[in-house]
Amino acid sequence: MEIANEKRIAGLVQFLWKGRTMTGRFRLPMLEEQAYEYLLAAYIMEVQLRYRRFIYNGFVEEQLKQVANCLTANTAKFGIVLCGGCGNGKTTMLKALQNLVRRLEILKPNLSPNAGHSSDNYYSFTIVNAMQIVQIRKTDYNKFCKLAKADMLGIDDIGTEPAEVQDYGNFMYPIKELLAMRYDAQLFTVFTTNLEPKEIRQRYGDRIADRLNEMMTKVVYRNLTYRTENAQMADGQG
């Protein structure tokens, strides 16, 4: 079906855009193949930090390729869900991405030519555990709001926290609230979880689940835990 007066409507759209800017999507400033190499190197380093031996396998290769694509592709999405069983590399990936962003010193988009070199002009990546978010929401709302506005936020172990907490008779839903705020602001978010997609919907409701589907790419970890003596590679805590 064609739009009536299409040229006039296009002109009105241009008029309404005046003074507005689109929220920039975080992307690594490199091609997908190079992003894969950087992520692999950062991942290996995280394994070495735990005094464990890294052995390359097909699971790791596929996970790294998917994340590299998410971080370089021209897409409307602005987040990643790392989901799967316990101990299979999700937190390691989260920490690898945090370190990579820190070391690359990536400038934010839409800066003025006179912005200078303040640290505020570069992307930063904060990681916080889901249980910590619940506690922060109860004790320090200003800090909670600051987390909600962080350039890039990694949330570890979503689903381990109480979905509902009570404070002086008031019921709060910290993770639902945080995810909704970041969705509205279109801020890059990564989280790890042991929950299945249907369990996420059951736990956080249709509204949040639908928003997550819009904002995030899902990377499923199908491998078994690395936290055994016979495992080929170690994980962080994911």
Can you say where each PLM-predicted feature lies in the sequence?
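A short, basic N-terminal segment
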Residues: 1-76, 229-238
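Walker A (P-loop) ATP-phosphate-binding motif of ABC ATPase nucleotide-binding domains
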Residues: 79
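Hydrophobic anchor at the beta1->P-loop junction of P-loop NTPases
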Residues: 82
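Conserved glycine(s) of the Walker
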Residues: 87-90
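Hydrophobic positions on the alpha1 helix immediately C-terminal to the Walker A/P-loop
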Residues: 93, 97
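Walker A/P-loop NTP-binding motif
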Residues: 99-102
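Conserved nucleotide-sensing/catalytic segment adjacent to the nucleotide-binding pocket
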Residues: 112-183
